[in-house]
Amino acid sequence: SAFPIEKGISYCRVFSVFFPSYNRGYGNNFSLQLGAFVFGAVNLDQIPLVISGKFSLPKTTSIGILNTSFALGGMYVQIPFEFFDEDIGLGIAFGTDTFGNNFNHFSTSIGWGYTRYSGDWELDDDPLINIAGNFRFTDSIALIGEQWFIPDLDLDDSPLILSTRFIGRKFAVDFGGIMTLENIVEGILPFPIINFTYHPR
């Protein structure tokens, strides 16, 4: 979403076991994430490192469901030298528009991927689009969903993620799956995902 992490608030998150991250809010508008992609027992110099930042603009509208928030951000992934002979990185620059509040909201995001190869930067011509939503059934249960639209990929093959979030005082756990419309039609089971979030304070 376009919502910022509040000033001084931090949390640790593990996405599908492979992507642990530390997230923190600075000031009232800037959020920072530091993470890594960890696949099994590998050396530290073989782990792709991730840094991302998001600047949430001051809210412009605050009337019920029309409560609107905007954010601009970017993510960068440094690929280890072990994988390629050259210095390689990739990432995305994006903008997000969110309607609603922290409990129930709907977001649309558009972003352009980019790559860095031996010091040369290249921006993709076509954008990625993401539509996401969060619906809070109770104080402790929420439904989370997002649909990706990827250039040169048919809608039937685009990733769809659905999960149920169980929310505690300091912990939250997501159980869900990644699927495509084609998988659903063919009766193929979703790829399972499980996420953990811990709020120290």
PLM regions: where:
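Transmembrane beta-barrel domains of Gram-negative outer membranes and organellar outer membranes
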Residues: 1-106, 112-117, 148-152, 156-201
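A mid-sequence, solvent-exposed acidic-amphipathic segment
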Residues: 108-153
